[in-house]
């Protein structure tokens, strides 16, 4: 009788559901897929479906035109009263029938859904991209996900939940939340799991206060949304690479049969996998769970995306790169040993694929380790444990080392062994929940999509960096209003990476399919990966991260964990010996940083828990000493002194260097929970502090792989666009000195950063729980309310600088341009200008600048920061305006207004995102002369960036903060502040007729100057309002061959990826060294250009090793 209650309840609910279905049977024929965009025709309410449908049968899609040639405006989703009344009933039915929730969990879900329903109705147009039914399911799925994650043993309103686990898994929830995407014209099918995971951060921004009231302050840490997103993306890349490697090594016994059957039937089955591939994937999952069972409840990616995926999305994240590589290599060894000979594509006698040999024959482990950049000793250490696990799973003895288990994959026992693996995984999965990794091998990867073009909501950088540089091969997002959320360098240099010719990778992008793999001939290519400087195929997500891991293992790991003799000499040459202070600071801060990782999700871990953080700490400290030594040598040459007390005695400088080193190590190992900005709080610094050392770090570490340089680029972009403008940024401490007129506004909003905590106090102030990712858009103090704080007054101040920036600060410009930072090493006339001392970036804001001219160090720092912000804004303004079809002269006006706002209305940027001001500026300039800006009509439906535009808008000039729509911000704040200058820009004839790009008209005056190639430095000079302005945006230079003058050096612009793709096939690209790609491992491309220039100019004999050739020229 105990079980009768739930059964009767389910029967009753099902009976009610059947009656509901009968009453709704008539409406099914009338329900049509909704079009987000439709013609402005008379409409009638469809009561059952809940949204308006045109009376005519014709439908208009995105980009269609009205009969008079105008753009079609987006329709708003409308809820009929009848449909609105049934929201809660349908949600209850879904919970009771579809998921069979118990009563406590059901009540929590109903409460969250009911209290958040007003938010659903208020934001209906920005949720999802399809019908109101899909929007309802999507919102309900997010509600259930939160309840699933937070109700297990949680305290709700003071009452302890009796249930230890919610009775459904994450994959079951995603399957129940079926999203039907109605944009058939675009042939896009959005899967539920992708749509739900992408909507979840925006959902949490809206319902965060409600969730906090129900589950307490720690709800964000327990949800770990970024970890779940990254886990799903990495699982997709993991299986894709596994499938490609499998097909490269082995045949499928039923491949021909299936091809013929599919051809005859006309059915397209792109997700067919053989039973042997299924066995290999399941064996991989089983070995992951059992061999490294201590970490079975943690999720993250590994360094090569081929490492172990710890699949519990709610309990933290961790990565173990070397162990993961070795684990995959070991799995490959097992498949090679046990795969039937008639299914093998390879021969053990192949000297290219199996290059490592001994006196006894082929060294299989060493050959695969060379291919996958794994360490032989690590693989050997795993053999014993893995063999014991396989023996236990199948009940057969298996000796240590390379051993053959009879009957493991033969035809008679394969099916039975596969069922054993399935049962083992099912038992584990039901106990931990999470994503079901079997969905890929079972053919459900087609349902989930490949994350490339499946959803207009998807953006690689969102899951990147979701895992930001996850930034991040670029997926071409289909969006009604494509903004520049993807870092600018990725759009142009997606095929370049160092040291091998690997392209940029966004974890959000779909890996290339096996059919399109350039490794179609494994005999030619497989063995070349292990050699240095060889011709390699284009990159994949795995090969990029493996290259980065190899750099860390081969370049950094062999270094000593102590300062070099030369660096110690610099320490002793200071006013006092600071060697002990430097060592102690490094150990304390790195302990704090990596203890935060350990505290984030290593509870209950034994044995291996201390190995990983200690290894990462050693790598970080070695990298720190290496780069610090290079900086000291550079400063010594510049200052002609060995005494660098002002720099080496600066506490903030050392903390930034240590944090940057730790960030690069964590980025190499792809630790999701410790993604940026997690390193800042343990180090006691702000994001603005870290931005001061990024360019110097890249400049002085010549071996830094391209992918890590891009990672630093992405970090700097994030700092420039939003993080430096947030409350508590140290940028305001310099700004209040450089711009005293802003002191009142800065103090009113309490924007100043707190003093940097002392080293001895950091250990007690930093709590691991606070290091976890926070959902963007939420603050500890909430969205609104008066904020009270004491006014901060600087001890001294200088007069504000003139409009613009000092041209002598070019040296501070970092690689935040439409190109990767590897090109920053190129020599150019602009880089020969005076460079500001490094010490001024970390000196006291009130201290006079070493550059003189009456400036303070605060002036220097702010001028450099504004230069970088203008460069970033210029790229985004041009990108947006070109995509919405605006003319060149209007783009220059937009930039002029933005420049004016930054220098003269700086308070507009406080606590806001720079893209908010970019959008408002573009709209304001286009609105005055009545230019068409139809792209903004659908900004609500682009979701990714547009959603962020609606957050953190300060509407009240007095009082607290308020979040709202960007249109309200534009009308209530932006227009009132910039109206006078907007009118001036439109009426001023000199501004309305911009000069030529290079100032050929001969007009005098200070202008903003941009070199022809975007890889050059951009110097933004100050200019008075109303002065003539040069063309800010130059076109791409002609890349056709030209005669080279022997009087000048050669400066080469990068070949755009689109032209590379047209001119060269993947195989042909391996025969050339493209511009920006070094011919030697971890070597700057500038060294190759030096050898080329020396040869062309014949100035002296150059013995430069260029791709194995020695250039020898006679002196002129």
Swiss-Prot record:
Q: Where is this region: Pocket?
A: 540-980
Q: Which gene encodes it?
A: RBR
Where in this protein does the record put region Spacer? 736-859
**InterPro entries tied to this protein:** Cyclin-like_sf, RB_A, RB_B, RB_fam, RB_N
Protein name, please? Retinoblastoma-related protein
Record flagged with keyword RNA-binding:
no
- Briefly state the protein's biological role: Regulator of biological processes that recruits a histone deacetylase to control gene transcription. May play a role in the entry into mitosis, negatively regulating the cell proliferation. Formation of stable complexes with geminiviridae replication-associated proteins may create a cellular environment which favors viral DNA replication.
Region (Domain A) residue spans: 540-735
